[in-house]
């Protein structure tokens, strides 16, 4: 499935739900649009940066109206390191999204019949508990979010 670079701005889009990999989603003209760092209920302007046959990927250009559930990220590295993609989401909503993701992957993607999936067991520690790092290597310089790659 090939991806094409596009430059499309979708304005005043309501974020509908959480998706896999810490992203959220909305729909535009029947196409699913995945957006990192968004919270269900946010109204945002989205810059579409990649387009594939069945979905678009975008980034938040502007938060028009934040969701009532949106939290201020607590980590100074939020949005850069990739470790805590759901920081703006309250912890209970993170747990609910993770349970829904498991169910979705088993039922919708795996075509399995499963019993009711119990709630995700919460951690006593809800900050600084991650033990995963994501490293990216390249022979090219790292670009920050506000830099133009062209």
Briefly describe each language-model feature range.
Residues 1-150:
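SAM-dependent transferase fold signal centered on methyltransferase-like domains
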């Amino acid at each position: 499935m090939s991806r094409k670079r596009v430059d499309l701005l979708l304005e005043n889009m309501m974020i509908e739900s959480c998706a896999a990999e810490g992203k959220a989603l909305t729909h535009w003209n029947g196409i699913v649009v995945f957006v990192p760092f968004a919270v269900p209920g946010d109204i945002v302007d989205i810059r579409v940066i990649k387009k594939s046959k069945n979905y678009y990927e975008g980034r938040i250009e502007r938060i028009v109206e934040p969701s009532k559930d949106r939290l201020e990220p607590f980590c100074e590295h939020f949005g850069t390191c990739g470790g805590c993609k759901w920081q703006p989401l309250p912890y209970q909503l993170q747990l609910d999204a993770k349970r829904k993701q498991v169910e979705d992957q088993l039922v919708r993607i795996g075509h399995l019949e499963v019993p009711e999936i119990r709630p995700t067991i919460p951690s006593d520690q809800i900050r600084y508990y991650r033990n995963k790092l994501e490293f990216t290597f390249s022979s090219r310089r790292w670009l920050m979010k506000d830099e133009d790659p062209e």
